[in-house]
Swiss-Prot record:
First-listed, main subcellular location of the protein, grouped into a coarse class: plastid
Any single Gene Ontology cellular-component annotation: chloroplast thylakoid membrane
Cellular compartment(s): Plastid, Chloroplast thylakoid membrane
Gene: ycf3
Protein name, entry field: Photosystem I assembly protein Ycf3
């Protein structure tokens, strides 16, 4: 195992232990604790490429999570899984749901733009490319220092 992998494993284990301690110490409801536990399980499964298990954990987390912003991240992660599996329409659906809850979720804006851009290039569809541009503009407006490739693409598009 390389040093980098050892460090990553150490960090993952440290995060897990720290998260367990925080969940036990912080004054949160039982539902919030269950939601967080399922969310962590989902993240771990997703990181290992166990997408079916990750989805199951995320759906359980949604049953218990009451915080709108936290729900948006769970839904966003579900979208990531669908995108990873090439299910762009499903991914778009979840990214849009995440944005309804959290309009400042720039990662969702970017990922929507990426899908529209890919579809626009594949089908030579100017409307899809315009949609991609609109979502990238929103993402760049919220996070000006990020998405440099998108900024360059937008400059060349004009």
């Amino acid at each position: 195992m390389s040093r980098s992998q050892k460090n990553d494993n150490f960090i993952d284990k440290t995060f897990t232990i720290l998260a367990d301690v925080l969940v036990k110490l912080l004054p949160t409801s039982q539902n919030a604790k269950k939601a967080f536990s399922y969310y962590r399980e989902g993240m771990a499964a997703q990181a290992e490429g166990e997408y079916a298990q990750a989805l199951e954990s995320y759906y359980h987390a949604l049953e218990f999570e009451e915080d709108v912003i936290d729900r948006s991240y769970i839904i966003y992660n579900i979208g990531l899984i669908y995108a990873s599996n090439g299910e762009d329409e499903q991914a778009l659906e979840y990214y849009h749901q995440a944005l309804e809850l959290n309009p400042r979720l720039v990662q969702a804006l970017n990922n929507i733009a990426v899908i529209y851009h890919k579809q626009g290039m594949t089908y030579q569809d100017e409307q899809l490319l315009q949609k991609a541009a609109a979502y990238w503009r929103k993402a760049i407006q919220l996070a000006p220092g990020q998405y440099l490739e998108a900024q360059n693409w937008l400059k060349n598009m004009v």
